[in-house]
Amino acid sequence: MENKKENFSEWYNEIIDLAKLSDKRYAIKGMNVWLPYGLKIMRLIDNIIRDNVDNKSFQEVSFPVLITRSQLETEFEHIKGFENEIYWVTKGGSEKLDIELALRPTSESAMYTMFPLWIRSHQDLPLKIYQIVSVYRYETKHTRSFIRVREIHFFEAHTAHVDYGDAERQMSEYMDIWSSIAEKLCLPYNIDMRPDWDKFPGAKYTLAFDTLMPSGRSLQIGTIHEYGENFARNYDIKYLDINGDLKYVSQTTFGLSERLLAAVIGIHGDDTGLILPASIAPVQAIIIPIPGKSFKEVLDYSGKILSMLKDINVRAEIDSRENYTPGYKYNDWEMRGVPLRIEIGSREMESSTVTVVSRLNKKRLNISIKEINNIKNMLNEHDKQLTLNAWKMMEENTVFIDDINNIPMNKDVLIKAYWCGSRECSDALEQKKDVTALGTLYNLNDSGKCIVCGNPGRLSMFARSY
């Protein structure tokens, strides 16, 4: 396997192939096949997202994949932002369609033509819905599994509110939801206010959740958008307030994608393979029976341990594959990122114990089956240590710069600097180091002199990005 530090790009591609997460050999570039193990992980991520939004009174929906051209063109700024990425359907069978149809690049245009039918009075608000679907974008840049693809596994939440203040409260709720999701995935991140030229098309402002990959490049792993009344005015989404006056709703959205899985792979993995957070590991503990004279009894004992683990809601399996040595199985499951390995031989059976090996630090611990509940604690500790390691990696590769001439030129890092917010100064940094402005750090009132022009600026982040 490639060395992660020396060649992250090759390591990343190789581990996706070895762990059988997806197969990129499908006939259409950028439309990859989800393989069983990768899909199981993604479904567990989806479950975390669902649990968090369901707890905040969101309702799940499912909209059609096709959108008419007129639906898309209702909001000019929105369609302008996607016009070069849209897949168009122009024929039905052998007949040319009278109305061109698009595969959804996102679902504002589809949903907001329905909102006026659902929203009539203040009693219908807030409206909070979401869906987890595929969206389609004709990506012309270099495609990369889970990072830049043409068919995107996508979560999108959409809300409508009585006024801007209530929409802003929703934005705060999104951040609480995101914090919980990121904690479960053990991911570090900054919250960056995107510059106006990089905000979501049609939004008043965009907040992005950006993490740092081991390559030194930034990866956007989530966004929330405040729309105000921009979309409501174009799609005529109005309601009668408590006084009987007709008003436009204010709207927000929240988007996440399979890039969450990309971040988990890249940030947590090592030269042995994946290291999965326990929260999304399809197998949290793998039981490896050790062959010997009493192997049938060892298998029976392993089955007993499996039942005990399932009783405490640990996702566990027994690797009873024949013609494979224990050593091969150890390496195979380590490569797949399973948090804990449980070795069971005649010695463990005779002493009513199990030997537990951590994927993260390789430490071995022999515990009595009376202490089997400790497996849950070990999984929690696994995730805590993953989180600490991930935040440490990002912090160690974040550099504060107060002079444009001090930008490190020999490696990619996350650059923190004061910036006035102008496009000119952002372009100057890009020419110097080939970095782009991720935006100003959200909710920080820290101010200083812009690293380029010396005018007043706010603390901001810059990086090469995927």
From Swiss-Prot:
Pfam families: HGTP_anticodon, ProRS-C_1, tRNA-synt_2b. Its EC number is 6.1.1.15. Gene3D superfamilies: Anticodon-binding domain, Bira Bifunctional Protein, Domain 2, C-terminal domain of ProRS. One of its GO terms (molecular function) is ATP binding. The keyword Mitochondrion does not apply. It is found in: Cytoplasm. Keywords: Aminoacyl-tRNA synthetase, ATP-binding, Cytoplasm, Ligase, Nucleotide-binding, Protein biosynthesis. InterPro entries: aa-tRNA-synt_IIb, aa-tRNA-synth_II, aa-tRNA-synth_II/BPL/LPL, Anticodon-bd, Anticodon-bd_dom_sf, Pro-tRNA-ligase_IIa, Pro-tRNA-ligase_IIa_arc-type, Pro-tRNA_ligase_II_C. It is an enzyme of class 6 (ligase). PROSITE patterns: AA_TRNA_LIGASE_II. Belongs to the class-II aminoacyl-tRNA synthetase family. ProS type 3 subfamily. HAMAP family: Pro_tRNA_synth_type3. Homodimer. PANTHER family: BIFUNCTIONAL GLUTAMATE_PROLINE--TRNA LIGASE, PROLYL-TRNA SYNTHETASE. This is Proline--tRNA ligase. It comes from Picrophilus torridus (strain ATCC 700027 / DSM 9790 / JCM 10055 / NBRC 100828 / KAW 2/3). The gene is proS.
